[in-house]
């Protein structure tokens, strides 16, 4: 279960959005920011003196200690979740960097996902090219993760409230916000669906496109729209 948040940060409530709820703690999502220099925090050792051998020995010792601790506390899923997270981290040290590397993707694929403007410095205003690049990158990474056996990938658009708003909670100006967000999302989403189909992955992949709730049909003060809890969209 991999989560690809908005490139500007988390949505409201942060990681609680992909917590395990009533399921065991190991069911929670793993956060990845594919546009950052280090997409997964603390994935690799920071100290030069930590070798692959010493890291493996440390992991073996930790596994034995955790097993002893866990056997004395049956039914507590928190330690099991931590154990699984370490095991996942060990696997990801080998597989994650390759999955995040887009250098072998063709120019046509990158362009389809809106990644033909990489390195552009975007201004503070919300705009289509920026949304297309960052949302498209997440869509392409999602395809690569699915190819490598990840069962569930969650892609987010829009971060927590700030000013000007860079999300879908458009109380002030719905055209300013929803226009670029929707156009940018359309580019990446269309490329992802087409790519999955061409590779035969759409045969066993379900795409669920959902939102929190809708907006009112009437304006709010001027150019914004208020919440409409009666029009959830899926």
Task: Label the model's feature ranges.
Residues 1-234:
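Ligand-binding pockets and gating/stacking loops
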């Amino acid at each position: 279960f991999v989560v690809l948040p908005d490139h500007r940060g988390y949505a409201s409530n942060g990681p609680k959005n992909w917590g395990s709820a009533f399921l065991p703690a190991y069911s929670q999502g793993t956060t990845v920011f594919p546009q950052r220099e280090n997409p997964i925090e603390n994935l690799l050792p920071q100290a030069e003196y930590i070798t692959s051998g010493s890291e493996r020995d440390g992991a073996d010792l930790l596994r034995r200690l955790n097993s002893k601790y866990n056997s004395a506390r049956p039914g507590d899923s928190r330690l099991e979740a931590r154990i699984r997270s370490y095991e996942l981290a060990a696997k990801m040290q080998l597989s994650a960097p390759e999955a995040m590397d887009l250098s072998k993707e063709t120019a046509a694929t990158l362009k389809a996902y809106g990644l033909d403007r990489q390195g552009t410095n975007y201004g503070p205003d919300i705009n289509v090219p920026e949304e297309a690049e960052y949302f498209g990158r997440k869509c392409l990474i999602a395809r690569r993760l699915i190819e490598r056996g990840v069962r569930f990938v969650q892609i987010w658009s829009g971060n927590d409230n700030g000013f000007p708003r860079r999300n879908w909670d458009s109380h002030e100006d719905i055209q300013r916000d929803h226009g670029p967000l929707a156009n940018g999302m359309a580019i990446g989403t269309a490329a992802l669906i087409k790519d999955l189909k061409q590779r035969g992955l759409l045969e066993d992949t379900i795409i669920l496109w959902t939102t929190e709730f809708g907006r009112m049909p009437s304006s709010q003060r001027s150019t914004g729209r208020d919440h409409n809890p009666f029009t959830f969209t899926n």
